[in-house]
Structure formats: C-alpha cells, structure tokens
C-alpha cells in the first residue's frame, strides 16, 4: 500500500483526532503568540513574572504527562480522558481575555497545561488503537501534520486579527475560544472508543518496572533531556 492510498483509507476517527489537534493548536498558539505582550504591556508584568508563568505552565504539562498514560491504560477510557483534557483546555480560553491580573493568567495557563498533559497520551493511544498496524505510521504522521498546521494558523490569525481589531488584544484573545470549542466538538462527535478496550487489563504503576528498561530507552531519554534543557522558552 503506497503512502497516498494509506492516507486516503485511514479511519475517519483518525482524521477527527487530527482536526481536533489542529483546532486546539490554532486556539492555543493564537493566545501564546500574544501572551507576553498582554502580560507585560496590558497587565504590567515584569520579565521575571513572565518567566514564572511560563515555567510553571510547562512544568505542569510535563509532570501531568507522566501519569496520564498510566491512567489511560488502567481505566481503558481513552476518549473520556482525551475529552477531559481538551475540555479543560477549552474552558480556560475565556480566562485570558477576562484576566485583570497576572494571577488569573497564571491560573489559566496552569489549568490549560494540565489539560494538555492529560490529553496527550490517551489521544496518541487512540490513534494506535483505531489504526491497523501497517497504517500507524501514516496515522501518526497525519495527526502531527494537522497539529503543525494549527500551530502555524494560530500566530498567523493573531497577526491578521490584531490588524483588523486595531490592536485590541482582549478582543483578539476572545477569538481563540472559537477553535477551542470546535476542537472539543469534533472529538466528541467524531471519535468512538474502540470496543476491544472494554476488556482492559490493569496496568499498575510500579517503580520496580524501571529496572526492566534497557539502555536504548535511557539513551533516548537522556538525549531528550539534554535537548529540552537547551530549549529556549517561546514566550
């Protein structure tokens, strides 16, 4: 099966997951592109406060991811967890234009990143569960491609909307609510939980299992850690 044929015959739910990622990334990146200006110019935050907000937000997302995969396997309710994660993120979007203090922005970012941490593992597991083994590469590639499209559309929309709204940043931030709601709607209506997950197997989280991980795993983890430490904040 060639790449074109494989992509055309991917399950409808995989396309729905991809569109969910596209819409949510459009919403998130629209906000993130304007957030430093909003914090420092509109709310009068310092560079230190901006760094604190972003540091707490990203740390929250990474820590939450550690447990979301285990929870997804244990409960076998991947769609429910994904909806919870995307739903929480969508619920935070109105908080940004409503914010009149740095504390409210921090709360919004904190909850938004919890949502991101919750949804990542069950969403990717859903892609694998919904797709035949020979199509999984194409399925993951499609979802990530649509995610990247959303990450591009968000900042582009911010530029256009700031121009059209005469630099009224609060009005522009309200527009981010629309794609966030679309993301949750597509996920709820377009994805069904695979039937075989109903007969799930419990997957206890045990520290002793770490000893079973081979050197190749730790090499990848080590490389990822180094690159992450070297990454600059996008704020």
Pin down the residues of each PLM region:
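Juxtamembrane intracellular "pre-TM" segments in multi-pass secondary transporters
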Residues: 1-12, 193-223
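Residue-level signature of mid-helix packing/kink "hotspots" within the transmembrane helices
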Residues: 58-66, 151-152
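Transmembrane alpha-helix termini and helix-breaking/packing motifs in multi-pass membrane transporters
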Residues: 37-42, 153-173
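Helix-loop boundary and gating motifs at the non-cytosolic
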Residues: 5-61, 216-235
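Structural signature of the two symmetry-related core transmembrane helices
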Residues: 80-95, 177
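Helix-to-loop junctions at the C-terminal end of transmembrane segments
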Residues: 64-77, 162
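Cytoplasmic helix-loop-helix junction between adjacent transmembrane helices
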Residues: 108-149
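C-terminal membrane-cytosol helix-exit motif in multi-pass small-molecule transporters
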Residues: 177-197
